[in-house]
Amino acid sequence: MQNSSPVSSTPDALPDSQPDSQPDDALRLGPVQAAQRLVLLHGWGADADDLLDLGELLVGPEVSVVALRAPEPHPSGSGRQWYSLQPIDWSALPAARLALRQRLERLAASVALENTVLLGFSQGSAMAIDVGCGLPLAGIVGCSGYPHQGWQAAGALPPVLLSHGREDPVVPFEASEELRRQLLQAGGQVELLPFSGGHGIDPELLPDLGAFVRRCLRGED
């Protein structure tokens, strides 16, 4: 579940990035002191740098962009994972969920969760929806994701925007349809943007994704 960003990104190409308190766990773009933030969760087998260029395209220079690195090494020896998918280890999910929640709460010390949008791709999208729906976030973007086993939407949900390719061979399009169904059933505000394509983020949807993120950060959704 790699190559999710429409443009490549590497840490060496980020001269204006800001060091994180745990530099191996996150990459940053934007001002050190910001009022708003976009947090990025990469997919299975990718790394923190994978979505940075995408994040920069979606928000203005005044917004802090933080790309988190998944805690576990990918079994291929390259990239990272939020939990094992080969084989799927659902028993590791509670710890992964708690670890991500704690990282987001630490980030909230500088930018409030109410002023933060969480965006994830594939496995990162599953984590964003699972953890983010239990936090007072400004919004969530889930790209080519899926619902975790046993997950149920509940409580006061942030606005959610989903995108998914109808021909996705990795995560079936129906997974996002199921997410949409569950979120609507729980009273959430959710939109699903389908596109003709496979497992990725459609460049033609970037204006829609950016508009949603900016509306959420302005408190309009």
Question: What is the predicted role of each segment?
Answer:
Residues 53, 130-131:
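Active-site signature of alpha/beta-hydrolase-fold catalytic machinery across serine-
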Residues 119-124, 128:
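Gly/Ala-rich beta-loop-alpha elbow adjacent to hydrolase catalytic centers
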Residues 174-221:
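C-terminal catalytic histidine-bearing segment of alpha/beta-hydrolase fold enzymes
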Residues 155-160, 186:
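Short, proline-enriched alpha-helix->beta-strand connector loops that line the catalytic pocket
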Residues 136-145:
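A conserved short beta-strand
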Residues 3-30:
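A short loop-to-beta-strand scaffold at the N-terminal edge of the catalytic core in hydrolase folds
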